[in-house]
């Protein structure tokens, strides 16, 4: 909405929209408008807090694209019992991704000083120190262009198979028309 531009530059939007979209029922459950530059994960965490007000205690799985995940976000969701599937960037948990020996594997992520440093002196940093490690299920999915995408989840193999996780994640692409 709205735009601001300088001479000889492309117009830029002046607000940013963050929303949680129900891919099964094709409806927005939570949304917020913000200034253009905002912390999407912090906003998502606030929206996740409000989901029970919107849908009651119906179980749900949050599906997020690259750019959202962070160790504190994963811990926050796991502490709240929120199930998630998140696409990782190749730079997220790089050591763990490169050492995956299977396409679907439970991985222990050590929360060492290098991972905590950025959060030092915060509640997130203290929680990371307290836990010492987290476990995430990492799933490698081959893409048509012969590259790999890696998903991280706290859903067990008993709850969802590798193929079901892949199908659930790709349902996320149905929201792209609303974000264009």
What residues fall within each predicted segment?
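Active-site- or DNA-interface-adjacent structural scaffold in DNA-acting proteins
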Residues: 1-2
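Single, function-defining residue in the core of a domain
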Residues: 9-180
